[in-house]
């Protein structure tokens, strides 16, 4: 079967809108494809990632059923601004990976800020000549979901492949499934050969290895063998090694015997830079107003932000509309409403009071001490930004005369933010903490 016919035949399996909106935009890339690797080009990187995630396995299965042959499906951006090196990776290396590395996850496409520069620096440093397995080993990167840990992990993988290294990238789930299936088939030698004989081992979400002692025992021996052979090991997790539940002490000790780097929620300027980078990479034009609205209205999960950008681009393309602030607000309204329903003013009050070492009762009183007034205004400001409470409702909460008192406080704190960079940073930090807590 001609691979270009796969999508046309798959059309019968999908509804018309689904096919027209997504798969009809794919073009078969014969030049980069091989017998067991089929490459398709999508209009941009965001669309490519979406189609790869949602339809990649379905396309592969359909191709196998129709042709009798197995093939890896790789969806990439036609206009991707990446070097040819990332598209010339040897098929043997691709087949050696548990999961294909995303070629767009590079160090160049990673936006560096105060929240991630230590993790970025450690990972980048080991990809210099003769540093793999010798400089920092292992590297353990942790932080909340959606902040770029996988991007950084795969950036190391892509850089290592360009150096001619054998790379294994796997999530904990991949690792567990590989072990289980090989155990059932009596082929553990194959499993050991795959994971132990690599130059670089990348494990995503290592915290999920704590399901069984047998899995951890296997990983312990694999870890030791790779380390003893000067292979590089990098892992990601939601928490530092000492806080991993269900993980044995000897594994925690191994994880901590190197660089431990955290990634925290980005400050507003880094968040805006990330959005600009995503738009630039995918040839999507958004005004400053829209970019600022996305940055201030959503949490810090980069995948969520990408999803919004994909939706905006899809709306504009399908409806033939310009992407305006009004369109952005319309597309995002349900998402923002859902976020706001998870955050209460009591949550905000509690966090601000803890930060300023003030009693909640003082903030809700009419006391005029400067630090209490500032804390009160910050609570009001954050409540307006992060909850659905109206000004009259806030006035009732603080037992103020009417909503004009709330409006006055909002105006004052806004002026203070404009003139005080440290206060602006502090409020942004508090906002990020509240958003992260609401997502946990």
From Swiss-Prot:
Residues 74-99 are annotated as: Domain II. GO terms for biological process: DNA replication initiation; regulation of DNA replication. Keywords: ATP-binding, Cytoplasm, DNA replication, DNA-binding, Lipid-binding, Nucleotide-binding. CDD domains: AAA (cd00009), Bac_DnaA_C (cd06571). Residues 317-440 are annotated as: Domain IV, binds dsDNA. One of its GO terms (molecular function) is DNA replication origin binding. The keyword rRNA-binding does not apply. Oligomerizes as a right-handed, spiral filament on DNA at oriC. Plays an essential role in the initiation and regulation of chromosomal replication. ATP-DnaA binds to the origin of replication (oriC) to initiate formation of the DNA replication initiation complex once per cell cycle. Binds the DnaA box (a 9 base pair repeat at the origin) and separates the double-stranded (ds)DNA. Forms a right-handed helical filament on oriC DNA; dsDNA binds to the exterior of the filament while single-stranded (ss)DNA is stabiized in the filament's interior. This is Chromosomal replication initiator protein DnaA.
């Amino acid at each position: 079967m001609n691979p270009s016919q796969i999508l046309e035949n798959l059309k019968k399996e999908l509804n018309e809108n689904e096919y027209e909106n997504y798969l009809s935009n794919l073009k078969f890339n014969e030049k980069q494809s091989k017998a067991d690797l089929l490459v398709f080009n999508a209009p941009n990187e965001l669309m490519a990632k979406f189609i790869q995630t949602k339809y990649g396995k379905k396309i592969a299965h359909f191709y196998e059923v129709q042709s009798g042959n197995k093939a890896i499906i790789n969806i990439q951006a036609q206009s991707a601004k990446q070097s040819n090196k990332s598209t010339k990776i040897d098929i043997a290396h691709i087949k050696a990976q548990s999961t294909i590395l995303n070629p767009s996850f590079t160090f160049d496409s990673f936006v560096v800020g105060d929240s991630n520069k230590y993790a970025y620096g450690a990972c980048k440093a080991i990809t210099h000549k003769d540093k793999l397995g010798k400089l920092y080993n292992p590297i353990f990167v942790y932080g909340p979901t959606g902040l770029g840990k996988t991007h950084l992990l795969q950036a190391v993988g892509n850089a290592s492949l360009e150096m001619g290294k054998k790379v294994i990238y796997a999530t904990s789930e991949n690792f567990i499934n590989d072990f289980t299936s090989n155990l059932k088939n009596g082929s553990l030698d194959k499993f050991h050969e795959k994971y132990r004989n690599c130059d670089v081992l990348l494990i995503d979400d290592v915290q999920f290895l704590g399901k069984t002692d047998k899995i951890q025992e296997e990983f312990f021996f694999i870890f030791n063998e790779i380390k003893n052979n000067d292979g590089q090991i990098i892992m990601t997790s939601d928490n530092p090694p000492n806080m991993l539940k269900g993980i044995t002490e000897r594994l925690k000790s191994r994880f901590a015997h190197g660089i431990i780097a955290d990634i925290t929620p980005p400050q507003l300027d880094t968040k805006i830079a990330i959005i600009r980078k995503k738009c630039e990479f995918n040839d999507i034009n958004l005004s400053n107003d829209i970019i600022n609205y996305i940055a201030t209205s959503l949490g810090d999960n980069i995948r969520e932000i990408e999803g919004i950008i994909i939706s905006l681009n899809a709306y504009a393309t399908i409806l033939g509309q310009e992407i305006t602030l009004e369109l952005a607000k319309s597309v995002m309204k349900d998402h923002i409403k859902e976020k706001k329903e998870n955050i209460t003013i009591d949550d905000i009050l509690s966090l601000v009071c803890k930060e300023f070492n003030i009693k909640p009762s003082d903030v809700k009183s009419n006391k005029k001490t400067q630090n209490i007034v500032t804390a009160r205004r910050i609570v009001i400001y954050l409540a307006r930004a992060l909850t659905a409470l109206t000004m009259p409702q806030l006035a009732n909460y603080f037992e103020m005369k009417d909503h004009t008192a709330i409006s006055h406080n909002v105006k004052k704190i806004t002026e203070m933010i404009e003139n005080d960079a440290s206060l602006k940073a502090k409020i942004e930090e508090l906002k990020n903490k509240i958003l992260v807590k609401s997502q946990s």
